[in-house]
Curated annotation (Swiss-Prot):
GO biological process, one term: long-chain fatty acid metabolic process
Native source species: Mus musculus (Mouse)
Gene: Acot1
Family under the similarity heading: Belongs to the C/M/P thioester hydrolase family.
Protein name: Acyl-coenzyme A thioesterase 1
Induction: In the liver, by peroxisome proliferator (Clofibrate) treatment, via the peroxisome proliferator-activated receptors (PPARs) or fasting for 24 hours.
């Protein structure tokens, strides 16, 4: 009997969907190795492998059969995706073009040899970033440079602006996936894209105000207010937008700073200067990476750099990786909570994830624990451990959807934190 590798869904799925992986037609108790490989848009290969043993019927199902070792061990149905590692050091898996899928190749090899035995079965699966019917609409309105993703069914939908970090450009993959959940999501560029400024010396809130007004006035966006979703620098900018601008009902901040970092934030006649960088506090890890977690002065000392969150009437959710080494995300979330409550504002929800690092992405993206930081100009450690980080991403994705459905007025069941 020939071995078969069975996937469900079989040929394609959305990136954030679970994938069922099973093998049939093996010998009873046969030892095998499963391998996965994905090539990104720049040609880098990401790989994972795990050793398994078939049951007495010659079958194994990753949802019921524990891995015996390899890139991960134990019962990990999606480990062949989240445990992938790049063949290039310090390389982060990023989807640049959401109109094409990532192609994942899976294979079953005989035995547990490190280099792999005879190939017994093989399958190819497409992981898509646009759910069927999701509409992708490039936006060039006034100064706004963005891409709007709309669900397939008729609107209006709850609206969300999505912001990434200091890498600049326009990343669409989180917005495109979220649009498949019933939201109108606009991925917003703010520098180093098209005709936008090439650097971040000053972040003018008027640009972001234009983006907010555009999305709020869109005929397929439900009012009166919209949501913000930001990670890292995008979280910092989301806090500034919620503090200075009108029409923002809800904001999710993923590992964001409460201080202006590396640039000035300005709105009308107000300016927030960047927090002081403490270069003597940059440490080196045993792997030769820079650790910058202590390299920013506390905004409790540099008080002028503290974003005035007390002005905001936005409802906040903070998602925090407790092993974030980019900066002190948990400290920032706690200080924001104290400041809001001291001014009679609603206490924000803070969900902390132990051993999760800086880049909390949609589910199944591999952990990027180290890489180039543009403001530092060197490879730094971002923190995190693969399994707890993967579990954090899974939970955070559900939490932010539940939060936005509740705050922006659409129905969704509550999701309890898993960690």
């Amino acid at each position: 009997m020939e071995a078969t590798l069975n996937l469900e869904p079989s040929g394609r799925s959305c990136w954030d969907e679970p994938l069922s992986i099973a093998v049939r037609g093996l010998a009873p108790e046969q030892p095998v190795t499963l391998r996965s490989v994905l090539r990104d848009e720049k040609g880098a290969l990401f790989r994972a492998h795990a050793r398994y043993r078939a049951d007495s019927h010659g079958e194994l199902d990753l949802a019921r059969t524990p891995a015996l070792g390899g890139s991960f061990s134990g019962l990990e149905p999606m480990g062949l995706l989240w445990a992938m590692e790049p063949d290039r050091p310090f390389w982060r898996l990023v989807k640049r073009d959401v109109q094409t899928p990532f192609v994942v190749e899976l294979e079953v090899l005989d035995g547990h040899e490190p280099d792999g035995g005879q190939r017994l079965a093989h399958a190819v699966h497409e992981r898509h970033f646009l759910a069927p019917g999701v509409r992708r609409v490039p936006v060039r309105e006034g100064r706004v440079r963005a891409t709007l993703f709309l669900p397939p069914e008729p609107g209006p939908f709850p609206g969300i602006i999505d912001l990434f970090g200091v890498g600049g450009g326009l990343l669409e993959y989180r917005a495109s996936l979220l649009a498949g959940k019933g939201f109108a999501v606009m991925a917003l560029a703010y520098y180093n894209y098209d005709d936008l400024p090439k650097n971040m010396e000053t972040m003018h809130m008027e640009y972001f105000e234009e983006a907010v007004n555009y999305l709020r006035s869109h005929p397929e966006v439900k009012g009166p207010g919209i949501g913000l979703l930001g990670i890292s620098k995008g979280g910092e900018l989301g806090l500034a937008m919620a503090s200075f601008l009108k029409g923002i009902t809800a904001a999710v901040v993923i590992n964001g700073s409460v201080a202006a970092v590396g640039n000035t934030i300005s709105y009308k006649d107000e300016t927030i200067p960047p927090v002081t960088i403490l270069r003597n506090q940059v440490k080196m890890t045993k792997d030769g990476l820079k650790d910058v977690v202590d390299a920013l002065q506390s905004p409790l000392v540099d008080k002028k750099s503290f974003i005035p969150v007390e002005r905001s009437d936005t409802t906040f959710l903070f998602l925090v990786g407790q092993d974030d080494h980019n900066w002190k995300s948990e400290f920032y979330a706690d200080e924001i909570s104290k400041r809001l409550q001291a001014h009679g504002k609603e206490k924000p929800q803070i969900i902390c994830y132990p051993a999760a690092g800086h880049y909390i992405e949609p589910p199944y993206f591999p952990l990027c624990s180290a890489g180039m930081h543009l403001l530092v100009g060197a490879n730094i450690t971002f923190g995190g451990e693969p399994k707890p980080h993967a579990m954090a991403q899974l939970d955070a994705w559900q939490q932010l959807q539940t939060f936005f459905h509740k705050q922006l007025g659409s129905e969704c069941l509550h999701v309890s934190p898993k960690i």
